[in-house]
Amino acid sequence: MATDSWALAVDEQEAAVKSMTNLQIKEEKVKADTNGIIKTSTTAEKTDEEEKEDRAAQSLLNKLIRSNLVDNTNQVEVLQRDPNSPLYSVKSFEELRLKPQLLQGVYAMGFNRPSKIQENALPMMLAEPPQNLIAQSQSGTGKTAAFVLAMLSRVEPSDRYPQCLCLSPTYELALQTGKVIEQMGKFYPELKLAYAVRGNKLERGQKISEQIVIGTPGTVLDWCSKLKFIDPKKIKVFVLDEADVMIATQGHQDQSIRIQRMLPRNCQMLLFSATFEDSVWKFAQKVVPDPNVIKLKREEETLDTIKQYYVLCSSRDEKFQALCNLYGAITIAQAMIFCHTRKTASWLAAELSKEGHQVALLSGEMMVEQRAAVIERFREGKEKVLVTTNVCARGIDVEQVSVVINFDLPVDKDGNPDNETYLHRIGRTGRFGKRGLAVNMVDSKHSMNILNRIQEHFNKKIERLDTDDLDEIEKIAN
């Protein structure tokens, strides 16, 4: 695979991430010795809503922290455009009759057999004549490798012009996809890759000879229309990745539709999204005519394996004391503690450090790569406590997490219970068939009301726990 300056940027990005994982993140001193604390500026209290991370950053974070595919047990639902055509899935990559150099690339990446989404999507994407596809797939399910394989399979290496076009919401996400193209195509040196991203300056009137172009909607639109670097009528495969992230960004939706309208009728359209809410579905139907559809039926998250308690407190300091009592009485392998604001999270991490706990702090102010490094350290057990705001409520599976503590209960911007976030938060424990423990700190009439409404929503009783009673705490550990 060619390595122009933008391809090199991919390697640099990867190297930066690797070095970040080994980085001892320097902490500001919080008085004595604060083990593993990353002190963040807290000039003003941030509300939970402000703290909610933008989707692109969350998506990038998920890519950086995934070392392997998610073991997904969800059922795949396939809706075919033509219900009379035979439906089949594959259990091995050999069944797809790939070009030998592509099969070699797939195996070199560590894929031994297709993932659940690949089993169903690849036969559709590689079918003749080409078929359009809308697919729902979370991070870590192998969907990037699937559409990259489809693009590489359609390319005619002897034709030196763009034949496959892939849109990503951000420069960083484009680089991540580019990295997969580089890896899978490394035994196919005739294939070249170009990045249509802001900052990649080309001479006006210049024609691109690379067969695959990956970029962000605004730049790709310029390259197709204004600058004429790409002849859209020669594009065979159009991929729109992370559609849910794309439509959350001002202007990207319209730009993507304008690009799609320039493409030939027989161009294969592939769209991927982690979620399928109405806005994404409407957008998908505008850009992908006559599609096959693959949906991952979401596994119902359950509270059945999680013991839930609440602790009555009257102040922040009392909540902290209750936390210390809990730690003093039971053995906790690893814990995640959720706070409402960055300021509280920073304060709590510092206080826990003073008590001698190995603490990591995760906050929206940190760079995505920094966050990935913190999560990796926690996953490796270098820190036993992860204090975080909502930034990290989803997508992080750490097998050793046995306790989740809601230092503050999750509420939406209107102050109502955020039931979905509650479920995702305490779902960090009780995974992998183990029993988990969730403890909720309640410090006011308002938070008691929130807790009662959460109980009603899930139809699950949350028991009161007296953290001053050592015997009672020891009982919950058994």
Curated annotation (Swiss-Prot):
N-acetylalanine: residues bearing it: A2
UniProt keyword Cell cycle, yes or no: no
Location in chain, cross-link Glycyl lysine isopeptide (Lys-Gly) (interchain with G-Cter in SUMO1): K26
EC class: hydrolase
Keywords from the UniProt entry: Acetylation, ATP-binding, Cytoplasm, Helicase, Hydrolase, Isopeptide bond, Nucleotide-binding, Nucleus, Phosphoprotein, RNA-binding, Ubl conjugation
Binding site for ATP: Q118, S137, Q138, S139, G140, T141, G142, K143, T144, R428, R431
Span of the annotated motif Q motif: 91-119
SUPFAM superfamilies for this protein: P-loop containing nucleoside triphosphate hydrolases
InterPro entries xrefs: DEAD/DEAH_box_helicase_dom, Helicase_ATP-bd, Helicase_C-like, P-loop_NTPase, RNA_helicase_DEAD_Q_motif
Domain Helicase C-terminal: 305-473
A GO-annotated cellular component: nucleoplasm
GO terms assigned for molecular function: ATP binding; ATP hydrolysis activity; mRNA binding; RNA helicase activity
Region (N-terminal lobe): 2-299
GO BP, one annotated term: positive regulation of apoptotic process
Glycyl lysine isopeptide (Lys-Gly) (interchain with G-Cter in SUMO2) cross-link, chain position(s): K26
Domain named Helicase ATP-binding: residues: 124-294
Annotated function: ATP-dependent RNA helicase involved in mRNA export from the nucleus. Rather than unwinding RNA duplexes, DDX19 functions as a remodeler of ribonucleoprotein particles, whereby proteins bound to nuclear mRNA are dissociated and replaced by cytoplasmic mRNA binding proteins.
Domain writeup: The N-terminal extension helix acts as an autoinhibitory domain, preventing ATP hydrolysis, unless the N-terminus of the protein is displaced by RNA binding, allowing cleft closure to bring key side chains into position for catalysis.
Family from the record: Belongs to the DEAD box helicase family. DDX19/DBP5 subfamily.
Name of the featured protein: ATP-dependent RNA helicase DDX19A
Record organism: Homo sapiens
